[in-house]
């Protein structure tokens, strides 16, 4: 759910004895850095009281794809949440978040902005996938995830355009 909430620009409402604050969901989780034991930006004594989803045009063209090892039905090798807002056949706004590739849901705003005003077609989604994963470095045991993520991004963007492709047993067009 974290990947989808990040893609949809959710806002986390936090309460503490000192008062309340709001944090964009994409900023709620942290990269390990010097404190790998802390995976979020909650401070001591704080409590999540609500999570809001802003009204956007993503309700029609949205998809979530989770790729996982057959032996493990819980943790994703790669997951992708995509929201597209179309107007006159062109992409007005795009949101793409990856899971399973970083310590937190991964978004690249420049890649989302690249899609604005473009046709929703495979070539544009492939270029976006390249932008999202530019500079990605894998290790011996997970290097395959980079190419897997690129393919998953393109597939999920195409799935978002066709909600019927998400029915159980449906075969995506890609």
Where are these regions (language model features)?
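C-terminal structural segment of proteins
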Residues: 1-174
